[in-house]
Amino acid sequence: SFIGLIAPNIARHLGFIKAKSELIASCVLGALLLCVTDSLAIFLAQWSLDMIPTGTATAGIGAPALIIIARKQMSAQDQLFFSMPKGPKFISPVAYFLLGTMIFGLLALSSLSQPSSDMGYFVIPDAFEWSIRWPRMLTAIFAGGGLAVAGVILQRLVYNPLASPDILGVSAGAVLALIFSSLFMGYSIHSLSPWVAFLGSAIALCLLLFLGKKHQFAPSILILTGISLTAVLEALVQFSLTRVGEGKYTLLAWLAGSTYRVEPESATIMAVVITACIGVALLLSRWVTLIAT
């Protein structure tokens, strides 16, 4: 997902420069972006023969956004040194009001979108429709917020506005660990996924920092190293998927990043865990500030 890249850059552009305010703003923006993208995937599915995964829709929006950010915020001298972009020093109350109105409006639009309804594109869902819709919305909101907070921490850790879990190989490490545990150890991809994914992402991050230590974590070198690490890990994932039979179709559907058929229990557990992690990040916001200095 590109949420970890886009949301922090938008937050800084709006003027949320301090670590704590940037974490909060990025969390809200990330939750909003992924929720709206999920609703867009539902809306576009009416012209498709199958459901459009939210991960696919996010990549389709995030890739052009990455190009725009790189063209507008980077210059020729950034080949040697990247710097965190600065936004306006003061944020007017009108900006807060407009941002809050936009968030409320888009969330309302997301919750009311029912493209398959005979009564129109946007209707108030009944109890049955809402029982299917709310786990998907909850998953998109908290997953987006968690990815955005992870993006803020990584960008401040390496002092690079283009750093995000998917670009630096952290997400690829989590995916590879899950694939290995599912294919070669017999575990279900849903049973131990949080712990296995955390272990894989932690190993990938440690490897990235180890490789970047020689060049004193130079932002440009670290980005290239992260892209290379991502390519290697994704190649291993593709190779692993070619070694199995029909079970790979379940894994491919999972890799697409769909929020379809998310169970209420899984969505609730994920929301609680991500809320706790975001709370810890806010409590340690001063450390995040010191990291970026």
Residue map of PLM features:
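Alpha-helical transmembrane segments in inner-membrane proteins
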Residues: 1-293
